[in-house]
Amino acid sequence: MLILASSSISRANLLKTAKIDFKQVGFDYDENLDKNISPFLYVQKIVLEKEKQFLSALSKDFQNQNLLFADSIVCIDEKILTKAKDKKEAYEMLALQNGKYASILSAFLLVKPEKRVFSLSKTTLYFKNFDENALNDYVENNLYKSKAGCIMCEGFHQNFITQQVGNLSTALGLDIQTLKAYL
Protein backbone atom coordinates (compact mmCIF):
# COMPACT_ATOMS: atom_id res chain seq x y z
CA MET A 1 0.00 0.00 0.00
CA LEU A 2 1.11 3.54 -0.79
CA ILE A 3 0.91 6.35 1.78
CA LEU A 4 -0.03 9.62 0.09
CA ALA A 5 1.48 12.24 2.41
CA SER A 6 -0.79 14.99 1.13
CA SER A 7 -4.28 16.33 1.65
CA SER A 8 -4.70 17.01 -2.09
CA ILE A 9 -8.08 15.87 -3.38
CA SER A 10 -6.79 15.94 -6.98
CA ARG A 11 -3.87 13.62 -6.21
CA ALA A 12 -6.14 11.23 -4.29
CA ASN A 13 -8.55 11.16 -7.25
CA LEU A 14 -5.70 10.44 -9.66
CA LEU A 15 -4.55 7.50 -7.54
CA LYS A 16 -8.13 6.16 -7.29
CA THR A 17 -8.64 6.44 -11.05
CA ALA A 18 -5.34 4.61 -11.62
CA LYS A 19 -6.51 1.87 -9.21
CA ILE A 20 -3.49 2.34 -6.95
CA ASP A 21 -4.06 1.11 -3.40
CA PHE A 22 -3.28 4.00 -1.06
CA LYS A 23 -4.02 5.66 2.24
CA GLN A 24 -4.09 9.43 2.41
CA VAL A 25 -2.41 11.09 5.38
CA GLY A 26 -2.91 14.85 5.54
CA PHE A 27 -0.11 16.96 6.96
CA ASP A 28 0.17 20.72 7.36
CA TYR A 29 3.40 21.64 5.57
CA ASP A 30 5.29 24.91 5.75
CA GLU A 31 5.90 25.61 2.06
CA ASN A 32 7.59 28.97 2.49
CA LEU A 33 10.75 28.84 0.44
CA ASP A 34 12.61 31.54 -1.41
CA LYS A 35 10.97 31.96 -4.83
CA ASN A 36 14.02 33.69 -6.30
CA ILE A 37 15.25 30.46 -7.86
CA SER A 38 14.25 28.61 -10.99
CA PRO A 39 10.74 27.11 -10.90
CA PHE A 40 12.19 23.65 -11.61
CA LEU A 41 14.47 23.86 -8.58
CA TYR A 42 11.77 25.42 -6.40
CA VAL A 43 9.21 22.60 -6.83
CA GLN A 44 11.87 19.98 -6.18
CA LYS A 45 12.98 21.72 -2.99
CA ILE A 46 9.37 21.92 -1.79
CA VAL A 47 8.94 18.15 -2.21
CA LEU A 48 12.17 17.42 -0.33
CA GLU A 49 11.11 19.82 2.41
CA LYS A 50 7.74 18.05 2.68
CA GLU A 51 9.54 14.74 3.15
CA LYS A 52 11.77 16.22 5.84
CA GLN A 53 8.87 17.79 7.77
CA PHE A 54 6.67 14.69 7.52
CA LEU A 55 9.36 12.27 8.61
CA SER A 56 10.58 14.47 11.46
CA ALA A 57 7.03 14.46 12.85
CA LEU A 58 5.78 10.98 11.94
CA SER A 59 8.70 8.73 10.99
CA LYS A 60 7.94 6.15 13.70
CA ASP A 61 4.40 5.69 12.36
CA PHE A 62 5.49 5.08 8.78
CA GLN A 63 8.75 3.10 8.91
CA ASN A 64 9.27 0.64 6.04
CA GLN A 65 6.25 1.89 4.13
CA ASN A 66 5.92 3.28 0.62
CA LEU A 67 5.56 7.04 1.02
CA LEU A 68 4.60 9.53 -1.68
CA PHE A 69 5.37 13.24 -1.39
CA ALA A 70 4.32 15.61 -4.17
CA ASP A 71 3.92 19.24 -5.08
CA SER A 72 2.94 21.31 -8.09
CA ILE A 73 3.52 24.89 -9.06
CA VAL A 74 2.55 26.98 -12.01
CA CYS A 75 5.07 29.12 -13.81
CA ILE A 76 4.72 31.68 -16.51
CA ASP A 77 8.13 32.22 -18.01
CA GLU A 78 10.26 32.17 -14.83
CA LYS A 79 7.58 33.60 -12.51
CA ILE A 80 6.47 31.07 -9.89
CA LEU A 81 2.78 30.98 -9.00
CA THR A 82 1.78 28.99 -5.94
CA LYS A 83 -1.63 29.12 -4.22
CA ALA A 84 -3.34 32.51 -4.20
CA LYS A 85 -3.73 33.97 -0.71
CA ASP A 86 -6.84 35.98 -1.58
CA LYS A 87 -9.14 37.07 -4.42
CA LYS A 88 -6.92 39.99 -5.42
CA GLU A 89 -3.96 37.66 -5.90
CA ALA A 90 -6.19 35.16 -7.73
CA TYR A 91 -7.28 37.82 -10.24
CA GLU A 92 -3.63 38.83 -10.75
CA MET A 93 -2.56 35.24 -11.42
CA LEU A 94 -5.44 34.61 -13.81
CA ALA A 95 -4.67 37.84 -15.69
CA LEU A 96 -1.18 36.47 -16.41
CA GLN A 97 -2.77 33.36 -18.02
CA ASN A 98 -5.63 35.00 -19.92
CA GLY A 99 -5.12 34.38 -23.64
CA LYS A 100 -1.61 33.10 -22.96
CA TYR A 101 -0.08 29.94 -21.51
CA ALA A 102 1.08 28.50 -18.23
CA SER A 103 3.33 25.58 -17.37
CA ILE A 104 2.54 23.25 -14.50
CA LEU A 105 5.54 21.62 -12.86
CA SER A 106 4.74 18.58 -10.75
CA ALA A 107 7.35 16.77 -8.72
CA PHE A 108 7.05 13.67 -6.63
CA LEU A 109 9.27 11.65 -4.35
CA LEU A 110 8.46 7.99 -3.87
CA VAL A 111 10.23 6.61 -0.80
CA LYS A 112 10.27 2.83 -0.64
CA PRO A 113 12.22 0.72 1.86
CA GLU A 114 14.64 -0.34 -0.90
CA LYS A 115 14.85 2.83 -3.04
CA ARG A 116 13.94 6.47 -3.63
CA VAL A 117 12.49 7.74 -6.90
CA PHE A 118 12.30 11.44 -7.72
CA SER A 119 10.35 12.66 -10.73
CA LEU A 120 9.78 16.10 -12.23
CA SER A 121 7.23 16.57 -15.01
CA LYS A 122 5.97 19.53 -16.98
CA THR A 123 2.72 20.20 -18.79
CA THR A 124 2.05 23.44 -20.64
CA LEU A 125 -1.48 24.66 -21.23
CA TYR A 126 -2.35 27.31 -23.80
CA PHE A 127 -5.49 29.34 -23.17
CA LYS A 128 -7.88 31.38 -25.23
CA ASN A 129 -9.23 34.53 -23.59
CA PHE A 130 -11.25 33.85 -20.46
CA ASP A 131 -14.92 34.73 -20.36
CA GLU A 132 -15.21 37.60 -17.88
CA ASN A 133 -18.39 36.30 -16.23
CA ALA A 134 -16.98 32.78 -15.85
CA LEU A 135 -13.75 34.24 -14.46
CA ASN A 136 -15.61 36.34 -11.89
CA ASP A 137 -17.76 33.36 -10.85
CA TYR A 138 -14.64 31.22 -10.46
CA VAL A 139 -12.91 33.71 -8.21
CA GLU A 140 -15.91 35.04 -6.29
CA ASN A 141 -17.04 31.49 -5.43
CA ASN A 142 -13.53 30.75 -4.09
CA LEU A 143 -13.02 27.84 -6.50
CA TYR A 144 -9.41 28.96 -7.06
CA LYS A 145 -8.48 28.13 -3.46
CA SER A 146 -5.93 25.37 -2.91
CA LYS A 147 -5.05 25.40 -6.63
CA ALA A 148 -1.48 26.16 -7.66
CA GLY A 149 -1.54 29.25 -9.84
CA CYS A 150 -5.35 29.16 -9.53
CA ILE A 151 -5.41 26.57 -12.33
CA MET A 152 -8.32 24.14 -12.25
CA CYS A 153 -7.94 21.91 -15.32
CA GLU A 154 -10.96 19.83 -14.40
CA GLY A 155 -13.12 22.93 -13.91
CA PHE A 156 -12.81 26.57 -14.91
CA HIS A 157 -9.77 26.27 -17.18
CA GLN A 158 -11.11 23.22 -19.03
CA ASN A 159 -13.28 25.39 -21.29
CA PHE A 160 -10.41 27.69 -22.25
CA ILE A 161 -7.57 25.26 -23.04
CA THR A 162 -6.65 25.42 -26.73
CA GLN A 163 -3.58 23.19 -26.56
CA GLN A 164 -1.98 20.87 -24.02
CA VAL A 165 1.66 19.78 -24.19
CA GLY A 166 2.30 17.04 -21.64
CA ASN A 167 0.17 14.74 -19.50
CA LEU A 168 -3.10 15.84 -17.96
CA SER A 169 -2.21 13.99 -14.74
CA THR A 170 0.87 16.21 -14.39
CA ALA A 171 -1.34 19.28 -14.74
CA LEU A 172 -3.63 17.82 -12.08
CA GLY A 173 -0.72 17.39 -9.68
CA LEU A 174 0.88 13.97 -10.15
CA ASP A 175 2.53 12.20 -13.09
CA ILE A 176 0.65 8.92 -12.69
CA GLN A 177 2.31 7.18 -15.65
CA THR A 178 5.78 7.63 -14.17
CA LEU A 179 4.64 6.76 -10.66
CA LYS A 180 3.05 3.49 -11.83
CA ALA A 181 6.34 2.47 -13.45
CA TYR A 182 8.05 2.49 -10.04
CA LEU A 183 5.39 0.92 -7.83
UniProtKB/Swiss-Prot annotation:
Its cofactor is a divalent metal cation. The keyword S-adenosyl-L-methionine does not apply. Pfam families: Maf. Keywords: Cytoplasm, Hydrolase, Nucleotide metabolism. GO terms for molecular function: nucleoside triphosphate diphosphatase activity. It is found in: Cytoplasm. Its EC number is 3.6.1.9. It catalyses: a ribonucleoside 5'-triphosphate + H2O = a ribonucleoside 5'-phosphate + diphosphate + H(+); a 2'-deoxyribonucleoside 5'-triphosphate + H2O = a 2'-deoxyribonucleoside 5'-phosphate + diphosphate + H(+). This is Nucleoside triphosphate pyrophosphatase. It comes from Campylobacter jejuni subsp. doylei (strain ATCC BAA-1458 / RM4099 / 269.97).
